[in-house]
Amino acid sequence: MTKPYVRLDKNDAAVLLVDHQAGLLSLVRDIEPDKFKNNVLALGDLAKYFNLPTILTTSFETGPNGPLVLELKAQFPDAPYIARPGNINAWDNEDFVKAVKATGKKQLIIAGVVTEVCVAFPALSAIEEGFDVFVVTDASGTFNEITRHSAWDRMSQAGAQLMTWFGVACELHRDWRNDIEGLATLFSNHIPDYRNLMTSYDTLTKQK
């Protein structure tokens, strides 16, 4: 049976950045490190561009998982920041769940490290509580492709939608006429080839 197309709505969405920690990032092998960090920061930038409530959380950061990556702290200095003392599933942490529910949003855009644990566990828990969950696959990382696909299968079968940060941005924006320069700048900052495209566009526009 075909599932209905549930679109992301910028007025009903929140972003959850789960366990993007220095130690855990060293485990990511299914995406090249530089590309992965770029994707994570791109997701952060689109959250700011669309004014989406954003929640940061870490797990056992005083241990080997390490602290939240500095760039995310810098992006969201005033965002709710839940340092979980030991809960592996972020949804098992009362403060985290309270912060999520306090946004008043039904759609949750989730990314994190590692995919099959730090993303999958809260995603499945949120679905069980009636949220629409959108997993940002290229801003989530894990050990290898086998592990990644196992996590994707589990989440998608439970009802999560798997998307990329670029797809998320486009679906939230809906129409280029809403803001050409703003969205193009977001893309250009994180996709080198898109920067070339916009340079060409700007040149042609100025010639008219």
Question: What are these model-derived regions, one by one?
Answer:
Residues 60-63, 87-90, 115-119, 144:
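Acidic, metal-coordinating catalytic cores used for nucleic-acid/nucleotide bond scission
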Residues 85-88, 138-141, 168:
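Short, acidic/turn-prone active-site loops that include or flank metal/cofactor-
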